[in-house]
Amino acid sequence: MIPDKLQNIMKQDGVVAIATLGPDGPHMVNTWNSYLKVSQDGRLFIPAGYMHKTEANIAYNPNVLITLGSSKVEGLHGMGAGFLIKGKASFVLSGADFDFMKEKFGWLRATLAVKIESATQTW
């Protein structure tokens, strides 16, 4: 479900924006492209150090929008490619998915797991 071009973007320097919607409106948080990992079943894993507002919003509404890109990857109109990911998210506080990410990011308090519903190249 994760296109090769998106996987290539994830290896590059860049910022990821994660949007959630809670009872008091939208909220955005950022992380780095290189922090994103893919599970064996195709879910997107994101280390959460803080993200307390994001966690509260996901408990209220699990829908997330994620954007990321890189100027170093060939896109639809030359150099520069980006994606919009839509999915359902949950916070994982223990178990195999948590341990997988904790090994890579010792500072995390939780794993943000996203079941991808669509990944659309936007640029």
Cite the ranges covered by each PLM segment:
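Binding-site signature for planar aromatic cofactors or substrates
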Residues: 1-123
